[in-house]
Each structure stands twice: as C-alpha cells, then as structure tokens.
Amino acid sequence: MGEWTILERLLEAAVQQHSTMIGRILLTVVVIFRILIVAIVGETVYDDEQTMFVCNTLQPGCNQACYDRAFPISHIRYWVFQIIMVCTPSLCFITYSVHQSAKQRERRYSTVFLALDRDPAESIGGPGGTGGGGSGGSKREDKKLQNAIVNGVLQNTETTSKETEPDCLEVKELAPHPSGLRTAARSKLRRQEGISRFYIIQVVFRNALEIGFLVGQYFLYGFSVPGLYECNRYPCIKEVECYVSRPTEKTVFLVFMFAVSGICVVLNLAELNHLGWRKIKLAVRGAQAKRKSVYEIRNKDLPRVSVPNFGRTQSSDSAYV
C-alpha cells in the first residue's frame, strides 16, 4: 500500500500546479476508483483466484493449463499494469515541470548575482555618500567602505571599533534593469509555453493508453466471468469442466473497471476540448517550427566550402560563344 501512496502523492504534485479542473477530477477518479479499490478490494477478491480454480480431473498439469487458457493475464495484474502505464505520462510531465522550475530558479539567481557584482562601489557609496563635508562625512564614508556584500546584504566588517559602534546591516536595493526584465519575461513565457505543450502531449498519450487498455480488456475477458469453463487443452486427456471461484463478484468488479476506464476516456477528451483543439494544433506546429529554426541555424553556422569551377570559361575567342 505504501507504493500506491507514493504514486498518489506524485500525481497530486503535478495536478496542483499545472492541471485544469477536469484534470483534477480525473485524478480523483484514478486515485479513488482505481488505485484504492484495486489495492484494497481487488487483492481480497482475487486472492484465491488460482487455488480455487478446480477442474474435474486428476490429470497432472491440467488445472494449470486450463487456468492459463481461461485467464492469460490475471485481472488484478492487468489492472495494476494499466495503472502504471496510464500514470507514466503524468510522471514524465512532473519530471519535466520540476526540471524547468529548477532551471528558471537558477537563471533568476544568476541574474541577481550579476546585478550585485555589476557596480558594488555605486551601491555602497551611493549618491550623496560623500556629502556632509568635514571629518564627520569622511568618517561615515570610511565606515561604508568597510562594509562587504554578502548575498545582496551589506554587512559591517569593521573589527577595530566594535566597542564603540555596533554592527549594522544595510539592505542593498537593486534597481530593476529594463533589459533584464524583458529577458526574464521572455524566458518565463517560453517556459510556460513549453510546460503547456508538454501537458497537452501527455494528455493525448494518456488517452491513447486508456483506449488501448480498454480494448485489450474487452478482447481478453469480455464483460462477464463465467462460473463454468470447458477446457480441452493439453495435457488434459479429454474435455474437462473447470469451476471459477466468485464469478458474480468478479463480473461486477470487471464491469466496474470497464466503467472507470470509460469515464477516464471521456474526461481526457473533455480536457482536450477544454484546452482547445486549436491550441493543440498550434502547440504541435510550434514544436515543428522550433525544430525547423534549429535546423536552419545549424546550417547557417556551417562553414561554406567553395568548390573551384573547372569548366570552360567563356571568352571572345571561344567557340561556344
């Protein structure tokens, strides 16, 4: 149960930051109606799945062969695999968004430190720092020059007059640089566009996986679990009858998982409609345009090799004029 709790927390981390309202409803459906029910109820229902699959024969290996024929993949294992695969696009989106946030934080800190180191004398002295005249002004300026910048804070480093003057801290105020603000705004806009594009892509992949597992579940099990299964598979000598434990309960559980998968598909389509098919097309075209621009830049940066022309040169005496 601890593994499911970790997966639930990871999904909540992605949804709380970047998901839409429909995405949050979808997370509730996935967490409550899939993870919790499969982890708690499913293990109880399918605990004796193979041990209680009994065939009316004493032929060695016949029970195992017929069980493999009736259930190529156990219901509970199929649903666990479905949950993991369907949640994989969301986990990839979490990794991408966390990576982009870390990069944005590093850029912001580097911009602040560059601004701090650009003109420390001006920030320490400041306009009017030498004003006041006389010995009093020079003393104040000497004290300011003895301050040091530590992470954007001016800290007094004077050691000779500790008894007479207490340490003082002066917060350095940075004037916003117009070009820096424009660069930060552009980088933030690019980051938001990248995150939105990746979110749309993961919703599309998640919906494709939902539909694939829904179709696979239908072809593997149908809509019901029969109580009696007839089998003539080797090594059974003749056709034997096998009995499945709790067929009605398993049928209800199977139909319930069909309904949950159908609801997830509908919610994914509704989220894509909410995001807008036009935005999805623009996101795909934006990715293609970005790849094209990178290709053009690379071709432009490649050195051009001039090939000498060894053909005939035209002149007034040439016969080809």
From Swiss-Prot:
Extracellular face residues: 43-75, 221-252
Topology with respect to the bilayer: Multi-pass membrane protein
Subcellular location: Cell membrane; Cell junction, Gap junction
Sample GO molecular function, one term: gap junction channel activity
Function (record text): One gap junction consists of a cluster of closely packed pairs of transmembrane channels, the connexons, through which materials of low MW diffuse from one cell to a neighboring cell.
Protein name: Gap junction delta-2 protein
Organism whose genome encodes this protein: Rattus norvegicus
Upper taxonomic lineage: Eukaryota, Metazoa, Chordata, Craniata, Vertebrata
Cleaved signal peptide residues: none
Keyword Magnesium in annotation: no
SMART domains per record: CNX, Connexin_CCC
Alphabetical list of PANTHER family matching this protein: CONNEXIN (PTHR11984), GAP JUNCTION DELTA-2 PROTEIN (PTHR11984:SF32)
GO CC term (a single one): synapse
InterPro entries: Connexin, Connexin36, Connexin_CCC, Connexin_CS, Connexin_N, Connexin_N_sf
Protein family (similarity comment): Belongs to the connexin family. Delta-type subfamily.
Subunit structure: A connexon is composed of a hexamer of connexins.
Tissue: Highly expressed in neurons.
Residue ranges annotated as Cytoplasmic topological domain: 1-19, 99-197, 276-321
Region Disordered: start-end pairs: 120-141
Biased composition (Gly residues): 125-137
UniProt-listed Gene3D superfamilies: Gap junction channel protein cysteine-rich domain
TM ranges: 20-42, 76-98, 198-220, 253-275
Protein's GO biological process: cell-cell signaling; chemical synaptic transmission; neuronal action potential; visual perception
Pfam families: Connexin
UniProt keyword annotations, A-Z: Cell junction, Cell membrane, Gap junction, Membrane, Transmembrane, Transmembrane helix
